[in-house]
Structure formats: structure tokens, C-alpha cells
Amino acid sequence: MKKVTAMLFSMAVGLNAVSMAAKAKASEEQETDVLLIGGGIMSATLGTYLRELEPEWSMTMVERLEGVAQESSNGWNNAGTGHSALMELNYTPQNADGSISIEKAVAINEAFQISRQFWAHQVERGVLRTPRSFINTVPHMSFVWGEDNVNFLRARYAALQQSSLFRGMRYSEDHAQIKEWAPLVMEGRDPQQKVAATRTEIGTDVNYGEITRQLIASLQKKSNFSLQLSSEVRALKRNDDNTWTVTVADLKNGTAQNIRAKFVFIGAGGAALKLLQESGIPEAKDYAGFPVGGQFLVSENPDVVNHHLAKVYGKASVGAPPMSVPHIDTRVLDGKRVVLFGPFATFSTKFLKNGSLWDLMSSTTTSNVMPMMHVGLDNFDLVKYLVSQVMLSEEDRFEALKEYYPQAKKEDWRLWQAGQRVQIIKRDAEKGGVLRLGTEVVSDQQGTIAALLGASPGASTAAPIMLNLLEKVFGDRVSSPQWQATLKAIVPSYGRKLNGDVAATERELQYTSEVLGLKYDKPQAADSTPKPQLKPQPVQKEVADIAL
């Protein structure tokens, strides 16, 4: 009996010692100036900015997976488009009088020019290497059929010619010309079908995963930067001095560590909302999220791939979210060309591709449940669209492909599940809650923590989004002569608009094209087109947009 008692006492002491050791390990605080949560393109971009602006600041990046750029930034988990509104028709909505609004298109294009300048600067510094590994010239095209859609594209083309950012765009309604631009799209098509297309040679395909890996690899060369993989944030607590204590679990050995940070950035993609809620800042209460996934059909058949060099976007059908429009794209992934068609919406309660089925439920709180319900009730057409997408059969997806590639063969294509996108739902005083397309930087009043919510245009505008975050959180420093000079070295057009300034637009496009190895020819005169008939549009309930 004494032996048993002694054994139990010994085990209890041992377990207590292990427990105390674990607690001691968790209580050992690592201190850092900046904590970057998430190993994607947003954290990598912000870290790169801060490395130039404040090289002495210490930075720590924590990533839940075993490597960086494995979620939404991964090339296979997104469309890889350098979004600049050259072909995306949802950025040029039609007004009630039939005219075309280009304000959103101009803003998107301006933002992408900042990304191009940021990447070019990093190439010149040796931070990014071999531009062809992450960005390639792929012409951007819009393609439509039917009298009304052709008339819309005419009006869109005419409206965009008023901006210096869209000079060089071509327009045609000629079958032979469009076939020369995009053979796959035209071969086998009814020669009597009314079609129209625009084409811009300076479009790009971008591998955001490769950019992310290279940016982080450069950051790792500095002794005051630390990357911790397989590390999951479990808790965030504000301290009395407005620093943050963040508890991080090592998923490989089960230990925990506390990191004390002066500034925290939550760039965790779909997981950002839950972490923002965990922080307890009042600004988080206005937000909820709704996850939507995307699938693509993929072809690696050389007969298909070598016959198509463009990204071709169509027009969304009536009742579908504008951003959901199908497109057939040349991609450069893992060093080789492939063709993708989609996206097709999917549904999962996960906020990340590698997330938990409990993500949606665990992010629903008493403060955001009502906005979510209002969005569902106000956007029944969107709900119907998502249900119809989830119910698509293999044959349905193939028929959708044949609208863009009439001679497609089933055996050339396979289905790929891309990443998850968490759509922003924000509390609204009038409607209760609204679905917001785009990204949004949410920060506390003290500027000690910030999160990026939303999905589109996302990675292609990482540089301007993080620039916006710097202005919002580090406003005093941004206005200082030192930071101003550095930011203008990184982004030459910082603080001014390119739109309307032909010389400045051409200068920046020429510069970034040369450094990034992209095609650029000075624009010629605009194509002559039939005059669009601006017909008043019937009043229709606006369909909320989502990003896939």
C-alpha cells in the first residue's frame, strides 16, 4: 500500500512539474515591435514596407500552417489576376440613364499601378527576383454576346477612353479579329452571333504566392525578424500600456508562448474576423462574415494551353452577383502555363480552406447575428444564386465552359477546389446589415491593432491596401519628412493621381514594365466603334456582389 501511495504521489508531483513547466514556458514573453499574424501577401507586404521605413523595428510573423502562402495567397487558390478593371465589367456599372460609370474602374486601376510600382521597387532592391517567376504579360479581354450586351460594351469602351489609364484598349465586333485575339473563344461559334470584345495588351497574370514567399525570404535575412510556422494564435489581450500580449500555440509540440507586441496586424485571411473579435476592441462588433468558396475547371493539355493567351471575362447573367462572372484564363503556375475556367461558387462553413467547420458558428455573436439575418433577408436573389451554384452537376459546369469555349472536350478538364473567401457583413443604421464587396482595414482608436477583412480585389491591391493601413495607424509618422521620402521612393506616384495625366501614366507604365519584364507599347489612337445607344435601364433590385 505504501508503494502504491508513493507511486501516486510521485506521479502527481511529476504531472504538476510538467504543468508548471508548461505554464512557465507560456509565461516567458517574447517582445517584438510588430507582430504579423498570418503568412500571406498582406503580412508580407506590410512587413516589407516597415522594413524600409523603420529598419530597426523588430518583427515577428506567426503562421498556422507549415509554410507561408499556403491559403488564399497560394497561386492555385485564387484567379491570379492583376485586377486593373481592364476587363472586369462589374467595375463599370450602368446608370439608370444608360450611361457607364467608370469611377470604380479608375480607382481599381490606380490601385494596381501602386502595386506594380511597389513590386518594381522591390525588384530593384533585390528583394524580389526573376520577375517572370511571379508576373507575366497576359492580355485582358472582355467578351460579350447579344445585342444589349454588345451595346453595353460599346458604351463602356467609349467611357473608358476618357481616362489616361485605359488608353491602348482595343475594341472589335469582327469575328475574325476576335478569333485572332482569342481563338478558343471563337472557334466553333455561330458566325451569325452578335459578339464584341475589348483587349488590352498590358494585362497581367500574377502568382501572389511566389511574391509572398520571396518577400518573406528577404525579411528572414534580417536578425530582427522572426518567422514562426505551425503556430496558432489562441488569445489576444490588451495591456495597460496599450501593448498586446498574444498567446501562440506551437501545433507540433503543444507548448504555448506569449508574445508582447507594440503593434499587431491581423492578416490571417478568413481567420482575421475571429481574431479581431478575440481582441475585444469595440470596432469589431460592427462586423460579421459569410464564407463562399470557389471551384475552377483546369486544363493542362498543351493543345488547349498553347491555343489561348488571354484572360477573357464575360458579363454576369441577370440575378447573379456581378463579380461572379465566368472567365477563361491563361495562368502561369509552378513554372508552366495552364488554362482555368470559372469560378463556380461552393459553400462551406469554413473560413479557410484549411479551417474548421465551426468557423461560421463560432464567429456569430449577439452583436452581429442581426446584421447577418438582415443581409440574408435583403439578398434572397443572392441566396438563390449560391444554392443554384452548389447544385451544379458536372454537365452543368461543362455547358457553362462551352459558352466561352464552344469546342471544349470533357477529357481535357479537371475540377479544382480553390480557396475560401469571407465576405464582409457590416452593421448598417438603415438596413440593419449590408454585404460589402472589397477589403476593409479595421483598427482600434489607439492604432495598436489592425485587421484586414474582405476578399476583393485583394492580393492585386495589397500594396495600396497596406499603404492605407500605414496612413490610418501610423498617421503622424506617415506625415513626417522621413517617411514621406521613403514612401515616394517605394511608390513614385504616391500622393497624386495618374488618371488624367497622360505623361505621368505613360512614364509609370514604362518604368514598371521595364523593371518587371512586361510588354508595353505606347497607346495608339482609339478604335472607331458604332455609337452606343444609351437606353434608360429598367429599375431592378440591386444584386449584392461577392468575391469568389
Swiss-Prot record:
User: What family is it from?
Assistant: Belongs to the MQO family.
Q: Which GO terms describe its molecular function?
A: 2-hydroxyglutarate dehydrogenase activity; L-malate dehydrogenase (quinone) activity
Q: What class of enzyme is it?
A: oxidoreductase
Record's keyword terms, sorted: FAD, Flavoprotein, Oxidoreductase, Tricarboxylic acid cycle
Reply yes or no: does the keyword Nucleus apply: no
Q: Where is the signal peptide?
A: none
EC number, UniProt record: 1.1.5.4
Pathway membership, UniProt: Carbohydrate metabolism; tricarboxylic acid cycle; oxaloacetate from (S)-malate (quinone route): step 1/1
Compositionally biased tracts (Low complexity): 530-541
Q: Where is this region: Disordered?
A: 521-548
Q: What Pfam families would the database entry show?
A: Mqo (PF06039)
UniProt keyword Flavoprotein present:
yes
Which prosthetic group or cofactor does it need? FAD
Tell me the Gene Ontology biological-process terms attached to this UniProt entry. tricarboxylic acid cycle
What is the catalytic activity of this protein? (S)-malate + a quinone = a quinol + oxaloacetate
Organism this protein belongs to: Escherichia coli O17:K52:H18 (strain UMN026 / ExPEC)
Q: What is this protein called?
A: Probable malate:quinone oxidoreductase
